[in-house]
A protein has these predicted regions:
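N-terminal amphipathic/basic-hydrophobic helices that include classical n-h-c signal peptides
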Residues: 1-26
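Terminal transmembrane helical module of multi-pass membrane proteins
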Residues: 139-212
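Short hydrophobic alpha-helical membrane-embedded segments
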Residues: 60, 115-123, 143-148
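Transmembrane alpha-helical segments of multi-pass membrane proteins
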Residues: 87-92, 96, 111-131, 172-177
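Hydrophobic alpha-helical transmembrane segments in multi-pass membrane proteins
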Residues: 59-64, 125-129, 178-183
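Selected alpha-helical membrane-embedding segments in polytopic membrane proteins
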Residues: 23-115
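Membrane-interfacial segments
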Residues: 43, 74, 78, 103-108, ...
Length: 212
């Protein structure tokens, strides 16, 4: 408790508050700048994609919100659904980074720290939130997702000095790992009573019928 009181006294000082806000803005500027560079296929060494934990958590939470909105027809829009979406986004980031590192290293690349680059490339999906407010952008959203995938693949090829086939092997490994881990997490949510299996089945049937 004394530590929290001390921290509270420190952050009440205007100079410290201003310095902290400037640091946050600087980190966000670096992250957004890296997003812009990656979007234009301008890559750097993976070791240079370093960000503060606060920025990384904020980006993952935003991606979780976008993911929750896209999955709301299946899982609903409750707190449990949002929590599940955020967890799945974090798991996706970890599994994809780890899978690509293992596959690229297997094919001769050094053990690359891909956490930062994967996060930057995944953050390019944040504009998809606009589709919820402007449904007419749905076609553009598909093109945007395709380009983000190309951006990520090209970056991994460049960083790992690998062919597109080897990178796709990494995506296969990621898909298998994500399917296993995601299924376990979903079952835990259902077992805990946070999600209802019958409701999920009804939503899935409604989605299937709507697409037919």
């Amino acid at each position: 408790m004394a530590v929290f009181r001390f921290a509270g006294l420190i952050f009440r000082r205007p100079k410290i508050q201003s310095a902290f806000l400037l640091w946050i803005y600087a980190m966000l500027y670096v992250f957004v700048r890296d997003m812009w560079d990656v979007l234009r296929l301008r890559y750097r060494s993976p070791e240079t994609y370093l960000y503060s934990p606060l920025v990384m958590v904020a980006v993952l939470l935003l991606l979780g919100v976008v993911n929750a909105a896209s999955m709301s027809p299946l899982f609903g829009s409750g707190a449990a659904a949002v929590c599940l979406s955020v967890i799945l986004v974090m798991v996706k980031w970890l599994v994809l980074s780890r899978s690509m590192r293992k596959v690229l290293h297997y094919y001769g690349a050094p053990r690359l720290p891909l956490w930062g680059f994967i996060l930057v490339s995944e953050a390019l999906l944040l504009p998809l939130l606009l589709v919820l407010y402007v449904p007419a952008l749905a076609a553009f959203a598909l093109l945007w997702q395709a380009w983000v995938f190309v951006v990520q693949v090209r970056g991994l090829m460049w960083m790992g000095n690998a062919t597109v086939g080897r990178v796709l092997v990494g995506y296969v490994l990621y898909g298998i790992g994500m399917l296993c881990v995601g299924t376990v997490i979903l079952m835990l949510f259902i077992a805990a009573g946070w999600l209802d299996m019958e409701t999920l089945n009804q939503n899935l049937q409604a989605l299937t019928s709507a697409r037919q």
